Amino acid sequence: MLRVIARLNTGGPALHVSYLSKGLESRGYHTTLVAGRLARGEDSMSFVAEELGVEVIALRELHREISPVYDPVAVARIVKEIRRVRPHILHTHTAKAGAVGRAAALLAGDAAPPVVVHTYHGHVLRGYFDPLTTQIFKETERALARHTTRLIAVGPEVRDDLVEIGIAPAEQFSVIRLGIDLDARVLNDASVREQQRRLFGVPDDRFVVGWIGRMTAIKRVPDVLASFKRLLELGVDATLCLVGDGPDRDDAERQAKELGIARHVLSVGYQREVSPYYALFDALVLPSANEGTPVVAIEALAAQRPVVATRVGGVPDVVTEGEDGFLVEVGDIDGLANALATLARDPELRRRMGEHGRERVIPRYRVERLVDDVDELYRELLSEKGLPLPPSS
């Protein structure tokens, strides 16, 4: 089979395709993984695939941005790869790879894969672009969906949103949640917390709010800072730790100074190993304008850290209101601050929410469950086409 992703940048899709490609080996699938190049300033997560022994074919012409120069070349390169591999299944991940990969399948002639699958790891059809661009993208997705055997959404909210805006009927979708090796990505060790607190000079009894991500407009980092300022005004002794880089980092650090909170803020930049930071945090804040399935929320809950987030995209499928975190509307600065204050003032509530979160996400987001679900779907689609099945494990 041929799997295509726009790029292996930091985030859930890169983890997903790496773990999935490796896991399906034991089920009799041979995967060729094609990945495009990172955008300027993005951090790579290709090391996950490398550590798993997954071979990646680099397609430098495949960029996240629309390019009248490079996009036709990327399509032609994928057509060539389809003709070389002759896959039974083409599976694309993320918007750009979905467009380029499925276009290539249409142009591959007699080598065209009989089964075409696309996974939406969220979508860019709300909150990312101006109305005209968004409408063009919607029409493109609708056209591509008519040539796709099955569409996958990483959560029911993502599926429902895509159905609502008319991308495809509900029966064309399957919901298959992410699978993550949480044991490898999250440390639940009190000694790590102590080490991190000593490293950054944070007293053990101080409430630490954490944020992890790429600093772009969709993540609404200004809301993180504004809600943290409000939290301090509520009388909470707190530190904010920002983990991540991106085009908005300088603006965020400037805003922290303008708000008068810079001495309470740790901005540590991109970190390849994030598990020690979950140990440092008491809670995670995630005020994004849009999310697919937020890996940072899953990892925080696995580390027994409650999450305060916005009620967007696939977030409600990860964070259960009042049980392992709190959900607010986008832009609700007071709501974010009040939820964080509630957690800061009640260590027992934090403990209960953290335990509930870990108990829920560990089984739900296992890699083995992901591989089982995708294997079952592939076998169903191959059977419908009358194609041979891989040997059962």
Please annotate each region the language model reported:
Residues Y270, A289:
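Aromatic "clamp/platform" in nucleotide-sugar-dependent glycosyltransferases that forms part
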